[in-house]
Amino acid sequence: MSFAEKLTGLMARPNQQDPAGGPEQPWYLKYGSRVLGIVAAFFAILFGLWNVLSIIGLSVSCLVAGIIQMLAGFVVMALEAPCCFICIEKVGSVADMMDTKPLYFRAGLYCAMAVPPIFMCFGLASLFGSGLIFATGAVYGMMALGKKASAAEMRAAAQQASYGGNAAPTTNDRAGIVNNAQPFSFTGAVGTDSNV
């Protein structure tokens, strides 16, 4: 396999069918989630390096948070864009294995990797770098939920599940929430009214 064939094979990932049998996603969600993941990984690595440099201020927790954030950035970059690690053979097979998993697995992994650096060293660098990875996980989670039904399907489901069973919908002006409700009576004031 030539270098060009390998590169085009790695770049064609978002067009492939979902091998896990999940719902079909629109093209902008497939490519958008990949691009968001790549951008998130880049900024996580960059701001993780910034947190690692905080060892100058003797902040060990920020050092560890920066290392974890950089590792999370490398993992996200390897899973979203394995073409960036083309010299490492196992990255492609790991990315292929991850593509066979359901989308909620990837969403959970990204969200779980993004949380520890934020709690260990709360600051703009860890919040922005890990927050983008968390946002990528949230997008994958929403993709895992799938698209909602059409308006006609939701309307039909609401009519079937309405209270009262198979009652046909009424178009009467006086139709209320409660069936067989009597109108209010305007007979006058109550006898015990003091008229104050």
Swiss-Prot record:
Transmembrane protein which mediates synaptic endocytosis, fitness-based cell culling, neuronal culling, morphogen gradient scaling, and calcium transport. Regulates synaptic endocytosis and hence couples exo- with endocytosis. Controls two major modes of synaptic vesicle (SV) endocytosis in the synaptic boutons of neuromuscular junctions (NMJs); Ca(2+) channel-independent Clathrin-mediated endocytosis (CME) in response to mild stimulation, and Ca(2+) channel-dependent activity-dependent bulk endocytosis (ADBE) in response to strong stimulation. GO terms for cellular component: cell projection; endosome; presynaptic membrane; synaptic vesicle membrane. The chain crosses the membrane at residues 36-56, 67-89, 114-134. InterPro entries: TVP18/Ca-channel_flower. It is found in: Cell membrane; Cytoplasmic vesicle, Secretory vesicle, Synaptic vesicle membrane; Presynaptic cell membrane; Endosome. It is a multi-pass membrane protein. It holds the Pfam family Cg6151-P. Homomultimer. Associates with the dally/ magu complex. PANTHER family: CALCIUM CHANNEL FLOWER HOMOLOG. Belongs to the calcium channel flower family. This is Calcium channel flower. Channel activity is inhibited by La(3+), which reduces Ca(2+) influx and thus inhibits it's function in promoting activity-dependent bulk endocytosis (ADBE) in response to high stimuli. The record marks 80 as: Calcium ion selectivity.
